[in-house]
């Protein structure tokens, strides 16, 4: 596969201290599972998401208690905050006033034009964007009557309906999502959207399932979309701790070379030649490098048959043998280490590489 091409013609949109679209990297987003009015629990979860690599976080804003919590939450976190609003324009106004960096609301669903105008005016004054969220499971009645069932054409038509409402009010800081739980439908909808308008696209396979099944489904769908150069932000939706969503999203982006601030692990599937405890070593190293924000490729390989050749693809790696391992750096043997010190020595080398990377970045 050739290099992934970003949709460089996508309109850039500011969200807090980030710019989405243009030539910028794909941004990882997640959503809290706490009651938003419970500020302590919500902030604690967002802090965990930040640590895992989440770059934008969305909170549900179903009522006034949730909207009233926005200012305090915003004050205590370090990443842009998105308020998710349905139907009630007053909650959108309150969230904007409270410091939300973006709101997710469909303008066609909040009533009379003056209500939409009030939300747009407030968003303009604060310089925050609006995400239009189209979902195959909640398309407008007129769309379903026209197409008979959720289709990609219907989803794009729904998005355009909401986009035009905002454009008529001279509002263009728009982000669009077209989510479906059916992977093929989502892929087709995003492809059509990318050909139809230049607003940034937020990717997601909605209601994808539990940690295992949802990871597979999201990787299949989001991977297919990303491989076409489509997408500016991404959320993996799982029936699991949202930290797991961030981990999966990061791995999907790394698989396509779209994450410049994350370390990657290569490890072999093991076979009868293995004479070291490779699985536990690989798991420990994976956990160790998960918080390293440098594009380092680390290999943990089980034997001397394929190990040296595969290690050449990595920046640093270890190939196990009988009770010892060969430590490689950029494909060349650095030294032999006993099995009991393999993990410790590999971690030291990873740290050195990370320090070298950060030193170059500062230079």
From Swiss-Prot:
[4Fe-4S] cluster binds at residues 268, 271, 303, 310. Binds 1 [4Fe-4S] cluster. GO terms for biological process: isopentenyl diphosphate biosynthetic process, methylerythritol 4-phosphate pathway; terpenoid biosynthetic process. The gene is ispG. This is 4-hydroxy-3-methylbut-2-en-1-yl diphosphate synthase (flavodoxin). Pathway: Isoprenoid biosynthesis; isopentenyl diphosphate biosynthesis via DXP pathway; isopentenyl diphosphate from 1-deoxy-D-xylulose 5-phosphate: step 5/6. Converts 2C-methyl-D-erythritol 2,4-cyclodiphosphate (ME-2,4cPP) into 1-hydroxy-2-methyl-2-(E)-butenyl 4-diphosphate. Belongs to the IspG family. Keywords: 4Fe-4S, Iron, Iron-sulfur, Isoprene biosynthesis, Metal-binding, Oxidoreductase. One of its GO terms (molecular function) is 4-hydroxy-3-methylbut-2-en-1-yl diphosphate synthase activity (ferredoxin). The keyword ATP-binding does not apply. It catalyses: (2E)-4-hydroxy-3-methylbut-2-enyl diphosphate + oxidized [flavodoxin] + H2O + 2 H(+) = 2-C-methyl-D-erythritol 2,4-cyclic diphosphate + reduced [flavodoxin]. The lineage of its organism: Bacteria, Bacillati, Bacillota, Bacilli, Bacillales. It comes from Geobacillus sp. (strain WCH70). It holds the Pfam family GcpE. The keyword Plastid does not apply. Its cofactor is [4Fe-4S] cluster. It comes from the Bacteria. Its EC number is 1.17.7.3.
């Amino acid at each position: 596969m050739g290099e992934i091409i970003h949709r460089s013609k996508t309109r850039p949109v500011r969200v807090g201290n980030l710019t989405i679209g243009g030539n910028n990297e794909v941004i990882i987003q997640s959503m809290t599972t706490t009651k938003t009015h419970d500020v302590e629990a919500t902030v604690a979860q967002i802090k965990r998401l930040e640590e895992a690599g989440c770059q934008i976080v969305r909170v549900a804003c179903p009522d006034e208690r949730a909207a009233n919590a926005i200012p305090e939450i915003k004050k205590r976190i370090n990443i842009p905050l998105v308020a998710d609003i349905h139907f009630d324009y007053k909650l959108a106004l309150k969230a904007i006033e409270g410091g939300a960096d973006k709101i997710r609301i469909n303008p066609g669903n909040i009533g009379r034009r003056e209500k939409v105008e009030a939300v747009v005016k407030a968003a303009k004054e604060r310089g925050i964007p609006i995400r239009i969220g189209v979902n195959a499971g909640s398309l407008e009645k007129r769309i379903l009557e026209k197409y008979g069932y959720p289709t990609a054409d219907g989803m794009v038509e729904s998005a355009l309906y909401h986009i035009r409402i905002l454009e008529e009010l001279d509002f263009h800081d728009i982000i669009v999502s077209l989510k479906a739980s059916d992977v093929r439908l989502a892929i087709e909808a995003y492809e059509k959207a990318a050909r139809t308008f230049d607003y940034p696209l937020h990717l997601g396979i909605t209601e994808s399932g539990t940690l295992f099944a949802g990871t597979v489904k999201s990787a299949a769908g989001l991977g297919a979309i990303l491989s076409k150069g489509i997408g500016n932000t991404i959320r993996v939706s799982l029936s699991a701790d949202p930290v797991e969503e961030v981990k999966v999203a990061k791995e999907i982006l790394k698989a396509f070379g779209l994450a410049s601030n994350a370390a990657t692990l290569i490890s072999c599937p093991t076979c009868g030649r293995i004479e070291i405890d490779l699985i536990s070593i690989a798991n420990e190293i994976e956990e160790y490098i998960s918080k390293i924000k440098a594009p380092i490729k680390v290999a943990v390989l089980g034997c001397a048959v394929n190990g040296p050749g595969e290690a050449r693809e990595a920046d640093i790696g270890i190939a196990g043998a009988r009770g010892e391992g060969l430590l490689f750096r950029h494909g060349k043997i650095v030294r032999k280490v006993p099995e009991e010190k393999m993990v410790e020595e590999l971690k030291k080398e990873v740290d050195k590489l990370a320090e070298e990377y950060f030193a170059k970045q500062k230079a």
